[in-house]
Regions:
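Hydrophobic/aromatic beta-strand patches that form the interior of the parallel beta-sheet core
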Residues: 3-5, 34-36, 58-60, 141, ...
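Terminal-proximal interaction/regulatory segments of ATP-powered molecular machines
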Residues: 242-246
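Generic beta-sheet signal
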Residues: 3-5, 89-93, 138-140
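Glycine-rich P-loop/Walker A and Walker A-like loops and their local beta1-loop-alpha1 context
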Residues: 1-28
Length: 246
């Protein structure tokens, strides 16, 4: 299946993908995990401090980074074919926005067709990849950034770049929004320790869609799921001021 995580800066997109990698590695001992970073912003030491077993993650060839949509298609296809149809696998692309297409790399940036070919290329690529992923036991997580929907009088004010291909081929589409910075006072000095994120699932073929939840991301730790779970239990009336209701 394909999962698309979309969000603006500081919405824990990479952190959420990292959490998925951590959970996968510890659950599937015989599985294969790959992370492809296209923005030159991923810190392995920080990810390891959050619990990611970096030695068990395939980070690709640093001498041959993914630059284009075509590079990504070839790399993911090789990953799927290498592990076979039965072995569980997870492949994270972070992010789709940093990829160009081969035609764009060759032409002048001032040409009128700039950017249009990438959307067409992505549509063709995901149509082919969706079938390969369906026949395999691989989860593909695609991280996307948001762009202002310039000229939009109605509807969404933001959109992802690269066209609408993932709207059709993704099984899950999750939008993340930054709500506020979490702070606490230490020795009379207010210090930030995390961020509060709202996650809205706008498409879901494996569970109930159009649901939202808030969770905390703590710097140097990751997703604070315990607090999120407690808040959810309070919200649905299963947790009182003392403890669980019977």
């Amino acid at each position: 299946r394909i999962t698309n995580i979309i969000g603006d800066k500081s919405t824990a997109k990479t952190a959420l993908a990292t959490e998925a990698l951590i959970n996968f590695v510890f659950k599937y001992k015989d599985g294969n995990a790959a992370y492809r970073e296209t923005e030159a912003a991923f810190d392995k030491e920080y990810a390891e401090a959050m619990g990611l077993p970096v030695k068990k993650i395939d980070f690709g060839n640093p001498d041959k980074p993914l630059l284009t949509v075509e590079d990504f298609e070839r790399d993911l296809t090789a990953f799927i074919e290498k592990q076979g149809p039965k072995v569980p696998g997870i492949y994270v692309l972070d992010s789709l926005d940093a990829l160009s297409d081969e035609a764009e790399m060759e032409r002048d940036i001032g040409e009128a067709t700039y950017g249009g070919n990438k959307a067409k290329q992505l549509s063709t690529m995901f149509r082919k990849l969706a079938r390969k992923i369906e026949m395999s036991n691989v989860l593909l997580i695609v991280v996307s950034q948001v762009r202002d929907n310039i000229g939009a009088m109605f509807g969404e004010k933001h959109k992802r770049s690269g066209g609408k291909a993932l709207d059709f081929y993704a099984s899950q589409i999750m939008w993340l929004a930054h709500l506020k910075i979490l702070k606490k006072t230490i020795n009379k000095v207010e210090r930030p320790y995390g961020i509060l994120i709202k996650s809205s699932v706008r498409k879901n073929k494996v569970a109930i869609a159009h649901r939202s939840a808030e969770f905390e991301f703590h710097f140097g730790y990751g997703v604070e799921d315990l607090t999120a779970s407690v808040n959810w239990l309070k919200e649905i009336g299963r947790l009182g001021s003392i403890g669980l209701k019977t």
